[in-house]
Amino acid sequence: MLLTGATGDSLSLRVSGYQFPDAEDPRKRYSWHMVSGEAGSAEGSWDFEWQALTCDESPRVSAWLRAAASQEGPAPLTFLEPNLRFRLAGDDAVGLVLKVDLDLEFLPPWNRHGYTGKPTTLRIAIGSECLRAAADAWDEEREHGAATGRDRE
């Protein structure tokens, strides 16, 4: 999934597998998705990977993006791990404005600290069609990433 704003901020996210791909107990094996990505802002670009979403949380990303694209004004999307948060911050001449907060293991290397609550925020002005396409891509990549994780058994 790729979100690219008109002002240059960007975020690429994908499910890259499971945290515990070799666990014998399927409840443990399929409990956490590994999320990897790249982010870019005026300050620079960086990569990250962490077990940031439970398998139950992962589908909420595409549902939230679709709700935002429909301008339903969804509430901020937060997760059990505080690495990632999506907020709808209004609109501008380009389209909707998303704010994506990246915290803890998703922070850029020049802004890392050992506590939560001081995220790096990407501002992404993006059209509704691009949000729908990102939601579709997330669903497809999530299924592929999960299948890749199962293949390692």
Predicted regions and their residues:
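Short, well-structured hydrophobic secondary-structure segments
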Residues: 30-73
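Generic structural signal for well-ordered, non-transmembrane alpha-helical segments
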Residues: 59, 94, 129-132
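Amphipathic protein-protein interaction modules
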Residues: 76-118
